[in-house]
């Protein structure tokens, strides 16, 4: 059976680093075996869901190259949920309850005060039809709970955490539908996973207890549960859960000049001991993706690492990939010359300005000015189409006896206004000969 994964964000905000890592790993898991990666918009929370966030989620996935093979929206699937809900009610697996949030909180506090786990006591199961009728007459509307089977132990072999076991007697029957008829997360998610043919659910370890409950939901719905794997959560560079991580969206990275390939390269390996390899494209990352390589320790996301990977990515980008982002007039030769010195593509503009001029050179002493005047005369006589930097420096070395830094640094400073930068052998041919002579003569 082909692998089918899904990414199921709620459109209540923009994607952050943790969301994107989940989406990427589901995409890699599916593509590793030629399977399908599906997007499901979990928009049952009508009050908080926004269409602008749906569009933002789609745009971010597109930018990252994580193109879904299909899309569903929960808000368009309510008839399916209603049908399955009624089936479970009739089977006795869903029941009505009426406790208010305050009443439930009081029950929890009493249990905790007695040193007992705060498990729902199933008081609502004792209500008779007459009790329900009386509550309805009084205007009380029920919320709905899924009845866990206390005689059916919950186990699964987690793709990352290994064998997992939960005792349903130590779990509360989850509320799956509010009194206003709106849905909570767990039942619609299980219904959709069945209907969409999901074979593998890969998500954060904060969903482990949800998985325990949903496994019984799959069984109650007459379906085989998918394979589950739960990743360790991301932390910041200091090793702690970070509010900044939850706020960092793809737009922030785009503004910083981060390329999508860098995000994919770093997040693909985050949580493993495998080195980040900027040379691997998405297809190669999918081929090497292996859940067994992921550990249970929190995965650290360091923005400094991302910028380092981004520089490595930029150094490999072909001209065709970046041409539309470069300043007017900057061709392939210029990109090839400047590329190794960039951390972000937009820095190419600064170096193109060095090529086109003007530049501001430092103030030189008399001896250096005399050397540069000789360099200007030499430059004026060179064949500019035949490695002018090599010819210029060789002639000056022979004529002045200068070598090393004393030879190269004044020339670089006069020609570019910088002490460091791209290889001069690649950069100098881009500067017009008369402009180079002018700079050396200035």
Swiss-Prot record:
Keyword Metal-binding (UniProt): no
Binding residues for ATP: 243
Family, per entry: Belongs to the class-I aminoacyl-tRNA synthetase family. Glutamate--tRNA ligase type 1 subfamily.
SUPFAM superfamilies associated with the record: An anticodon-binding domain of class I aminoacyl-tRNA synthetases, Nucleotidylyl transferase
Disulfide bonds: none
Enzyme class: ligase
EC number assigned by the record: 6.1.1.17
UniProt catalytic activity: tRNA(Glu) + L-glutamate + ATP = L-glutamyl-tRNA(Glu) + AMP + diphosphate
Gene Ontology, cellular component aspect: cytoplasm
Role noted for this protein: Catalyzes the attachment of glutamate to tRNA(Glu) in a two-step reaction: glutamate is first activated by ATP to form Glu-AMP and then transferred to the acceptor end of tRNA(Glu).
Position of sequence motif 'KMSKS' region: 240-244
Subcellular location: Cytoplasm
Major location (coarse): cytoplasm
UniProt-listed Pfam families: Anticodon_2, tRNA-synt_1c
Protein's UniProt keywords contain Amino-acid biosynthesis: no
Gene name, Swiss-Prot/TrEMBL: gltX1
Alphabetized NCBIfam families for the sequence: gltX_bact
Organism: Novosphingobium aromaticivorans (strain ATCC 700278 / DSM 12444 / CCUG 56034 / CIP 105152 / NBRC 16084 / F199)
Motif ('HIGH' region): 9-19
GO terms classed as biological process: glutamyl-tRNA aminoacylation
Name of the protein this chain belongs to: Glutamate--tRNA ligase 1
Subunit structure: Monomer.
Keywords carried by this UniProt record: Aminoacyl-tRNA synthetase, ATP-binding, Cytoplasm, Ligase, Nucleotide-binding, Protein biosynthesis
MF-aspect GO terms: ATP binding; glutamate-tRNA ligase activity; tRNA binding
